Amino acid sequence: RFYLCLHPFSGRLMKKKKELLRVFQTSDRLLAILIDPDKVNFSKLENLIEHLPKATTHLFVGGSTVEENLTEKLVRQLKAKTPLPIFIFPGDYTQITNEADALLFLSLLSGRNPEFLIEQQVKSVEKLKNTSLEIIPTAYLLIDGGRETSVQRVSKTLPMKQENVQAIVNTALAGEYSGKQLIYLEAGSGASTKVSTGIISAVKKEVSIPIIVGGGIRSKKE
């Protein structure tokens, strides 16, 4: 899965959050590849790394439903095979591992299920108290990609309709106003329709924090 961020990330490991975010806030684009621990073939991991697009700047690791400790196993093996920074993108708190470089600390703002608005975050605190992970508060907005996604099933929430641009913009702004440092617009794994350029432009015009766009992106050109 391809993920586009409207701001770049350096290939070197950042140790201070202010440095990491400063790099995010520059003007170029970057490309992240999401690897789901529950779907990856570990025996072919080296081949997967070798065939990553040349434009890849970092990796996301995570999924909606992942066996406990599998994320840590995958991150550890990836770190041994690539210098690319690894961000964990957890579907729940059990996927958090200190082996990664950074954590997208997600709040599902497009839905109203308290489990994914705050309860998973509270459950993660004991793991995060003494972590070396860069923790990045992230507003996560599920956008309708034309088919039901695993995020929708697991979270028991509905995605935001693509035609409701103002509602999407307002939700993104609410995320920024509440202290989030990234906006994540997600059409979902296997989406038949990616987040429209109109939505991306409208959100980018209104927010002052970086935007990540994912789901339905099948090529570097997209």
Pin down the residues of each PLM region.
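N-terminal amphipathic alpha-helix/helix-capping segment at the start of soluble metabolic enzymes
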Residues: 11-35, 127-137, 144
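Alpha/beta enzyme core
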Residues: 37-66, 72-84, 90-132, 136-140, ...
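N-terminal amphipathic/basic-hydrophobic helices that include classical n-h-c signal peptides
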Residues: 1-13
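A structural signal for short, well-ordered beta-strand segments and their strand-loop junctions
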Residues: 5, 87-88
